[in-house]
């Protein structure tokens, strides 16, 4: 219910309370039991008012006055008037109390909403801090991984350079082996020193001469 509708409803109740009070006043004059209750209540109010005024009069030094009860017509009229005014006052007071209670409840709800919003913001701040911490850890790990990747790339480059050097050495060894003849090829390339057959046969057919013997004997 909106505040405007509530105020209009309260004004309507206050406006309707006046004719209702007049109806109560009329019923008090016509209804027997209601009339009796109004008379008793009006006489009680008259006595209470007289005592209060008598006390004030005595304090001010005035003369004592004898209490005279109200007649039935005045008592009924006074009682009915009091009841109607009491009804109007009750309706107006109830409307004021309801508006006050509604305003307090609205303020309490607003405070609760603000408290919930603050609590939600606090939880959001905690969640954001946790996310930032996780991002910091992830960034740190990312940096470490990037550093490791750079080291791996550098190592791979070193391996590539080493592999190139090895291939170069193997090619040079292969070239050197091709240019250097083997032992068998060297043996085949060296000529053999054979004694001619004719010389050997001549030595066998012609033994040493006698002159040679005499020289050797002497």
Swiss-Prot record:
Keywords: Coiled coil. This is OPA3-like protein. GO terms for cellular component: cytoplasm; mitochondrial outer membrane; mitochondrion. Residues 176-189, 208-218 have a biased composition (Polar residues). It comes from Schizosaccharomyces pombe (strain 972 / ATCC 24843). Residues 194-206 have a biased composition (Basic and acidic residues). Pfam families: OPA3 (PF07047). Residues 175-218 are annotated as: Disordered. GO terms for biological process: regulation of lipid metabolic process. Residues 129-179 form a coiled coil. Belongs to the OPA3 family.
